């Protein structure tokens, strides 16, 4: 991908390209996503598009990077050290805060769907690795404070927590797709947090 050519595009056209690609990658797997649909949606000529974008892989990486920046402006997870003083009270606050922000954040919603549809992409893998590293650091603070089980191996505990949180995401995604207007996010979060606490608590 030509970063220089992308940077030289008018801001409105850059935004239209990223928005069209984000919608495409969020609604389909990487294999099913169509560059032709993206080109038509953002109303670029094929010659202009391919002057900037050299592959579907580079476009997805670009989209993930932009959505991460936009999502960070809406919500950023706290530093792991913030969990040290009162692990479970902080965990409840973070869970509630994420639940409050997520339904209103277009970037978070799109990024969430892209991650689930394109786990093998390098940009998505990098994001997943950063998330798993954060989870491990958070749990280490919980272990050190005695808030969570210290008998379980730390790596197994982190894997179990990350897997359960991924299951929560998958379940919530199905709920919102099936009944987007009636999904009870508050009740769902209560059920999820209770299960997570049962898994981890000392």
Residue spans for each PLM region:
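N-terminal intrinsically disordered/low-complexity leader segments
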Residues: 1-12, 174
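Hydrophobic/aromatic-rich alpha-helical bundle segments in the mid-to-C-terminal region
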Residues: 110-113, 143-192
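Short, basic, alpha-helical segments at the C-terminal edge of helix-turn-helix-like DNA-binding modules
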Residues: 64-71
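Hydrophobic alpha-helical connector segments
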Residues: 62, 76-104, 154, 158-161, ...
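An amphipathic alpha-helix signature
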Residues: 92, 96, 132, 136-140, ...
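Helix-turn-helix
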Residues: 16, 24-58, 62
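Short secondary-structure transition hinges
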Residues: 96-136, 155-158
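Short amphipathic alpha-helical elements of helix-turn-helix/winged-helix folds
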Residues: 20-24, 41, 62, 97, ...
């Amino acid at each position: 991908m030509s970063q220089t050519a992308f940077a030289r595009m008018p801001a409105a056209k850059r935004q239209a390209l990223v928005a069209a690609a984000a919608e495409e990658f969020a609604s389909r797997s990487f294999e099913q996503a169509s560059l032709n649909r993206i080109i038509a949606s953002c109303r670029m000529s094929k010659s202009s598009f391919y002057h900037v974008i050299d592959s579907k892989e580079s476009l997805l990486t670009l989209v993930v990077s932009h959505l991460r920046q936009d999502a960070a402006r809406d919500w950023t997870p706290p530093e792991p050290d913030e969990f040290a003083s009162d692990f479970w009270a902080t965990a409840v606050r973070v869970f509630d805060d994420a639940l409050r922000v997520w339904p209103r954040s277009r970037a978070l919603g799109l990024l969430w769907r892209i991650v689930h549809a394109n786990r093998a992409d390098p940009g998505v893998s990098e994001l997943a690795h950063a998330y798993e590293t954060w989870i491990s650091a958070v749990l280490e603070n919980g272990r050190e404070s005695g808030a969570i089980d210290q008998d379980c191996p730390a790596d197994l505990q982190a894997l179990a927590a990350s897997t359960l949180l991924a299951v929560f995401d998958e379940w919530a995604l199905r709920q919102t797709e099936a009944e987007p207007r009636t999904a009870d996010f508050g009740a769902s979060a209560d059920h999820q947090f209770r299960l997570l606490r049962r898994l981890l608590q000392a």
